[in-house]
A protein has these predicted regions:
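A mature extracytoplasmic/lumenal domain signature
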Residues: 38, 151-154, 179-181
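Short, surface-exposed coil-to-beta transition loops
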Residues: 68, 131-132, 158-163
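N-terminal Sec/ER secretory leader and immediately downstream segment
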Residues: 2-92
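Short acidic-hydrophobic surface loop/beta-edge motif
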Residues: 22-27, 136-138, 168
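Non-cytosolic head/periplasmic domains of membrane-anchored proteins
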Residues: 71-153
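Glycine-centered tight beta-turn/hairpin loop motif at sheet-sheet or coil-to-beta transitions
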Residues: 27-31, 143, 172
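Long, compositionally biased interface segments
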Residues: 158-207
Length: 207
């Protein structure tokens, strides 16, 4: 039957879709416009009001799922990298970069370890609730800080995405990005790409 073929097709996709239809999702006062093949969960692929939106995209072009890149989206192509992103109402008054001075810096000891990629790594204290975690800090061209939180070396192999970074976008949204630490080799490109993707996705960006 037609219905049976449609359901079978969905199952063969493994929960992914190659449908590029744009959905408009409203979270609070913000409107997000996203293609269905970038939306991670089938139940979120609809227009309307939501409390959260979860996305995934192929680095570096931020493409959604297609038959051509099926292996990458099924974690079966080690040469391709997925970034996972979530949008939800802000729960903190500052994003990760904004938390560096008032929060993270109060926990850090010493000057940290300067890495070849230009970032400085600081281990976060376990007694503050951080287990096998560090923050990596970089200086942007405008003098502001790039901050990411990562699993420390040796623990990373247990996680598909070893680092995360959140930024404030729109009127009242936070975008959390999760990605492998290998992308920090060119962290400035990553930083710009995440901001550009947010600007493209959130249609109520604060001037």
């Amino acid at each position: 039957s037609l219905i049976g073929r449609e359901i079978g097709g969905r199952l063969s996709m493994g929960g992914h879709t190659d449908d590029a239809t744009i959905h408009e999702v409203v979270i609070g006062n913000d409107v997000l416009a996203v293609s269905a093949n970038r939306i991670r969960y089938p139940e979120q692929r609809r227009d309307g009001v939501a409390g959260r939106l979860d996305l995934y995209a192929l680095w570096p072009d931020m493409q959604g799922f297609s038959e051509e890149n099926r292996l990458a989206f099924n974690n079966a192509d080690a040469s391709k990298v997925l970034i996972f992103l979530s949008f939800e109402p802000r729960s903190l008054s500052r994003d990760m970069s904004g938390r560096l001075a008032p929060i993270y810096s109060q926990m850090l000891k010493g000057s940290g370890e300067l890495l070849p990629n230009g970032l400085t790594r600081h281990e976060l204290p376990a007694d503050a609730g951080f287990v096998d975690e560090s923050i990596l800090v970089g200086q942007r061209n405008d003098g502001t800080k790039f901050v990411a939180r990562c699993l420390i070396p040796g623990a990373e192999q247990s996680a598909a995405a070893g680092c995360d970074r959140d930024i404030h976008v729109g009127d009242d949204l936070a975008m959390m990005a999760r990605f492998p630490s290998s992308l920090l080799d060119d962290w400035k490109t990553l930083d710009l790409a995440l901001s550009a993707f947010a600007a493209q996705t959130v249609k109520t960006m604060t001037p």
